Structure formats: structure tokens, C-alpha cells
């Protein structure tokens, strides 16, 4: 794998850009699928319990919108998975035994579950019993959620690799415990934070569409009842998202301190570190960390970051310089960047020597000695591909502002749900609250921006790693011509844009043409 040190940098950039493009487009569809699945399940449950035709018509309406979005999510998701084999073949070879397992379970169990019951949900009205149809609706949503679980397990493993061991004979990482991978604390926190945030997206979407009807004084009963359900889902989901986000912050502080430092533009850490509310971080250039200091015009909450990251107001939080230079936390010394890079290069050299002697039928004692040395240095294997310590620092401005967009919009959404929920659960929703309805429409794009911002922090914050500390992106990429990757980037850009325009157009047509009295 040492030849990867000379790979074309533009190939890495185009491969990353293509994967980012696909992931961003895919994530436009996934949150609405999971969020609408919950809300339409609640609405059909109301129909099952009351027998009122109104609830059936309401559930059918939201199911139509769900179906359009579901199809787009599947299409973009399939392309995303194929990119691991086409653009990231070294990654697939190195950890395919581990990474492929949760994706295989997702495909065999969750996807088939969704595919089966979504057909019953759409075509089973008047053909199956109300109870079976209700079960199919809930199982469609459950299948989508299970699918999200296994995909997030795979992603969480990239952020915090556990349950595996490197085999020098095959030059691959092999799974040693499926349970450790599937039930990693990082995966559990990531799943609950992600899924509850999708419920927020679904609730905002329902409120926005319903408010569009109220603005035009159409389908007012359906709109009011939908807002009532969505506002409750939104309030509960927003609280859960904030709570699980707090748990995730602690895990990030423990396992990915550089990501946390990037989110905060924290150069020099310490105890009792303040949480930055806002600061004038230059969005166009990476700060000079060697000089230390802090961002100008900084407004901060005293001891806030220590409380968030360690649940102690005096907790120690390392900054970028601390991580690069080495630091001590809880009595444990963390190596400096140079020490990790040296250990990584030694691991690469040891592996090459092991394989050469293995091919030459060397003695078992010599091979065992090399294997022992390799095992000691393997936690730093990925650092051997890092040329300069500056590569270990994610791009600070994007992480800093994306995190604040996510948190800021999330806080705003909590207030939005409280206001619209309070109004919705009165006897009647006034048709004259035009400002509120317009605000609901404005919240929809903001919610999507915040949702995407969360994933930007999660993925860009761990750069330069494809797998944290184990494999940098420079070592994960396929040996392709950068021009071919650039070409497919623009082809996918056109394709995904057409798909997005098609979805929005179809949804708008469904919303405009809906008439409950027909």
C-alpha cells in the first residue's frame, strides 16, 4: 500500500467530491422518508381506532408524498453504495469484511421488508383488512428505520472502529465481534440522534404543507389536524434530538477530539473551556494554528464546552495545538502527531517486511516477532500515510459554521413547534395568521439546511480519515484517472438535479391537485 503515497491529489479531491455530492443528495430524501413514516402511521392509527373516513383520506394523502420521496431515496442510495467499490476499492479491500456485514444485513432484512410492505400499503386499501393494512404501514416505516440502523452502524464504525483485528497475511481487517460492531456505543448514539432528527424534518414538512393549504383556505380540517399531530411529534423529536446530540458530543470528545476542536475553532484547550456561541472565523482560509490564540469577536458561554464534552464544568478539552503536540488527559498521555506518524510508518515497514519474509518461507519465530511489533503499532497505521501534521486538521471554517447552523436552526425549530403547537391545539386555528403560515414555509428549507449541516460536521470533521486513525482517504481511493471521476461527478450532478426537480414537481402537483371532497 506504500505506492498510495504518490497518488494523484486531484483524484482524491474528485473522489471525495463525488461521494459528498451523492451523500448530500441522498440525505435530502432519507429524513423525509423516516419522518413521514412515523406521522402517516399515527394518522392511519387514528383511522383504525375511530373508523372515520377523514383519517383514511388524510393518511392516503401523506402516503402519496411518502411514496415519491421513498423512490428517490432508494435510487440515490443504491448509487452511493456502489461508489465504495468503484471509487474506494482500497477501502473496500482493507475493511470490506467488516463494513460489508451491516450493509448486507440492511439489504437482506430491512430493504426486503420495506419493499414488501410498501406495496401492501399502497395497493392494499380495500384489499386487506384495516388491521393488516395498518400493520403494513407501520412495518414500512420500521423497515426504513432498521435500514437506517445498519447503515449508521457502518458509518459509526468508520468513525470509531471496534470489533476487528488486522490480519497481516491478507492485509485486511477482519471482524472479531459482530456484537461489538452492531452495538457500538458510538453507533447507538448516532442512530438515535439521526433518526430523531428525521422526525423533526418530517414534522416541519407536514406543518409547512398544511400551512400552505391554510394560506389558501383549502383543506382546512385536514391541515389543522395534520399540524396538531406534527407539532407534538416535532416537540418530542426536537427534545430527543438535543438530548441524543449531547450524548454524541461526549462520544466525539472521547474518540475524535480533533473533530470537536474543529467544530469550536479551539486552538489551545484546557480545563473549564468556554463554548463559543459565535465568532468571526474567516470562512475562506484555514487558521494558522501554530500561533494559537482564538477567533476574533468571540462570544462564548463560560465553561460551556467542558460541560458539553465531559459533563463537568472543569473538564479538560484539548485544542488543535494540544492534539498535534501531544497532551495528557485523565492520567493518560496522548502521542504527538509526529510520534503517531513515526509509529504509522514503522507499521507500514513492518508489514512489508512480514509479507516479504512470509513469501520467502521465513521461520515462525521471526514472523511472530514481526507480527507482535505490527500489532503494537497498528493503532497508528493510518498515520503512516500522513506527510504533514497540518493534514490532520479538518477544515475549520466549514465545521465551525455548519455546527452552529445545525444547533441554531434546531433551537429555532423548538420554538416554532411550541408556538404552532400551542395555536394548533386551541379549538380552532385562525385562518388570519398569515405570518405564522409563511414562517412555517420558511422553516422547511432551513430544516433541510440544518440536517445537511449535521452530516457535514460528522463527515468533514473526521478528515483526513476514511476510517478514524486506521485509513486516511489518500489510502482508501481507487487507482483511477481523475478525469473519469470528474466526468462521472458532473453526470451524477445532472442526474441527481433532474431527480430532485422531478420529485419537487411531482410533490407540488400532488399537493396542488389534492381535494378531499372528490
Where are these regions (language model features)?
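Polytopic transmembrane helical bundles with strong interfacial aromatic enrichment
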Residues: 1-518
Amino acid at each position: 500500500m506504500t505506492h498510495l503515497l504518490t497518488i494523484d491529489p486531484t483524484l482524491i479531491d474528485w473522489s471525495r467530491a463525488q461521494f459528498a455530492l451523492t451523500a448530500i443528495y441522498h440525505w435530502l430524501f432519507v429524513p423525509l422518508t423516516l419522518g413521514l413514516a412515523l406521522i402517516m402511521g399515527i394518522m392511519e392509527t387514528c383511522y383504525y381506532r375511530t373508523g372515520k373516513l377523514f383519517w383514511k383520506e388524510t393518511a392516503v394523502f401523506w402516503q402519496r408524498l411518502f411514496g415519491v420521496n421513498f423512490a428517490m431515496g432508494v435510487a440515490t442510495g443504491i448509487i452511493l453504495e456502489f461508489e465504495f467499490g468503484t471509487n474506494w476499492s482500497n477501502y473496500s479491500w482493507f475493511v470490506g469484511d467488516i463494513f460489508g456485514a451491516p450493509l448486507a444485513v440492511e439489504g437482506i432484512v430491512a430493504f426486503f421488508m420495506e419493499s414488501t410492505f410498501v406495496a401492501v400499503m399502497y395497493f392494499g386499501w380495500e384489499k386487506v383488512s384495516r388491521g393488516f393494512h395498518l400493520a403494513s404501514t407501520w412495518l414500512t416505516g420500521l423497515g426504513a428505520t432498521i435500514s437506517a440502523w445498519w447503515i449508521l452502524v457502518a458509518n459509526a464504525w468508520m468513525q470509531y472502529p471496534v470489533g476487528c483485528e488486522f490480519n497481516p497475511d491478507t492485509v485486511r481487517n477482519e471482524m472479531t465481534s459482530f456484537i461489538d460492531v452492531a452495538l457500538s456505543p458510538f453507533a447507538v448514539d448516532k442512530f438515535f440522534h439521526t433518526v430523531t432528527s428525521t422526525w423533526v424534518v418530517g414534522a416541519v414538512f407536514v406543518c409547512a404543507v398544511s400551512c400552505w393549504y391554510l394560506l389558501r383556505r383549502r383543506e382546512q380540517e385536514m391541515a389543522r389536524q395534520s399540524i396538531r399531530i406534527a407539532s407534538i411529534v416535532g416537540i418530542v423529536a426536537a427534545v430527543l434530538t438535543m438530548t441524543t446530540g449531547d450524548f454524541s458530543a461526549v462520544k466525539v470528545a472521547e474518540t475524535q477530539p480533533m473533530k470537536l476542536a474543529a467544530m469550536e475553532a479551539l486552538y489551545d484547550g484546557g480545563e473549564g473551556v468556554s463554548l463559543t456561541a459565535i465568532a468571526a472565523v474567516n470562512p475562506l482560509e484555514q487558521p494558522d494554528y501554530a500561533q494559537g490564540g482564538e477567533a476574533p469577536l468571540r462570544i462564548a458561554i463560560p465553561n460551556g464546552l467542558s460541560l458539553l464534552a465531559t459533563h463537568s464544568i472543569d473538564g479538560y478539552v484539548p485544542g488543535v495545538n494540544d492534539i498535534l503536540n501531544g497532551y495528557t488527559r485523565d492520567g493518560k498521555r496522548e502521542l504527538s502527531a509526529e510520534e503517531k506518524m513515526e509509529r504509522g510508518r514503522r507499521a507500514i515497514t513492518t508489514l512489508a517486511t512480514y509479507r516479504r519474509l512470509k513469501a520467502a518461507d521465513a521461520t515462525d519465530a521471526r514472523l511472530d516477532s514481526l507480527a507482535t511489533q505490527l500489532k503494537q503499532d497498528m493503532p497508528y497505521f493510518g498515520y503512516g500515510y500522513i506527510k504533514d501534521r497540518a493534514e490532520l486538521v479538518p477544515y475549520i471554517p466549514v465545521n465551525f459554521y455548519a455546527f452552529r447552523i445545525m444547533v441554531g436552526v434546531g433551537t429555532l425549530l423548538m420554538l416554532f413547534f411550541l408556538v404552532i403547537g400551542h395555536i394548533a391545539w386551541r379549538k380552532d386555528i385562525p385562518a388570519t395568521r398569515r405570518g405564522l403560515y409563511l414562517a412555517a414555509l420558511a422553516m422547511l428549507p432551513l430544516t433541510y439546511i440544518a440536517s445537511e449541516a449535521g452530516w457535514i460536521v460528522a463527515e468533514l470533521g473526521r478528515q483526513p480519515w476514511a476510517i478514524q486513525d486506521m485509513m486516511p482517504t489518500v489510502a482508501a481511493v481507487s487507482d483511477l484517472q481523475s478525469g473519469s471521476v470528474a466526468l462521472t461527478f458532473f453526470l451524477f450532478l445532472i442526474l441527481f438535479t433532474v431527480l430532485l426537480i422531478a420529485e419537487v414537481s411531482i410533490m407540488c402537483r400532488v399537493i396542488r391537485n389534492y381535494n378531499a371532497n372528490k
